Design a protein with these regions (language model features):
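Glycine/proline-rich loop-helix segments at beta-alpha junctions forming the active-site rim
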Residues: 85-201
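Compositionally biased amphipathic helical and low-complexity segments enriched in hydrophobic
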Residues: 9, 33, 130-133
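Helix-enriched interaction subdomains in cytosolic or periplasmic regions
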Residues: 1-14
Length: 201
């Protein structure tokens, strides 16, 4: 009788006080592409145990042909989906996100929409998405088959079976303002436009 042996390697990175988890890495096939998924906040399930979210992430990642996933979050504090312990900034977490997405073949932004009106969520989302701009060509979100339910968290019933949709950072945060080059005389430029218009008349 034929048998199949599989190995699931797990690596988890925590803060020194073990109150934050910056990275949960699951690898089952080194020869296949890897993805990074950014969600809201981590649970304590980081080893043998799998919470519902991680289980859905692993199943869907495997079905889509990936061989590993880096599970990341906007906020690193364990079991804080209510964002009661949320900080304005977390450089260590942001650094972990950037290091992961640099190596990933695809990035999935899946923080969900449940906290979209929260100021601390908006602030952290802007920080993270700004850092993701250089990797925007790899950025996607979860959607349903019709493509109407975008920006979903993996626990959303609408995306239990994943469909990926390209995501532009500008869909969620404003584009940075373009600064005028030094020495540019804006008033003079406006005046020249006016004169040109008169001459054209």
């Amino acid at each position: 009788m034929p048998s199949i042996t599989t190995t699931l390697t797990t690596v988890a990175t925590f803060s020194d006080d073990n109150l934050k988890r910056y990275l949960l890495r699951k690898i089952w096939d080194e020869n296949k592409p890897k993805l990074a998924i950014i969600m809201l906040a981590p649970s304590e399930a980081a080893g043998i145990e799998l919470d519902n979210t991680t289980l859905l992430v692993l199943n869907n990642s495997s079905r889509l042909g990936y061989g590993g996933v880096d599970v990341l979050n906007l906020f690193a504090t364990l079991n804080d989906c209510g964002l009661k312990e949320a900080e304005d900034e977390d450089p260590d977490n942001l650094n972990a996100i950037v290091q992961s997405v640099q190596k990933a073949d695809i990035i999935i932004y899946a923080a969900g929409v449940g906290k979209a009106k929260s100021k601390v969520f908006q602030h952290r989302q802007e920080q993270v998405l700004t850092a993701l701009r250089p990797y925007e060509d790899k950025l996607h979100c979860l959607t349903n088959e019709s493509g109407r339910a975008r920006l979903q968290h993996p626990l959303s019933p609408a995306v239990r079976t994943w469909h990926l949709s390209p995501l532009k950072v500008s869909e969620l945060i404003a584009e940075p303002e373009k600064k005028e080059p030094k020495g540019t005389d804006t008033k003079a430029k406006k005046g020249r436009h006016k004169n040109t218009a008169k001459e054209a008349e």
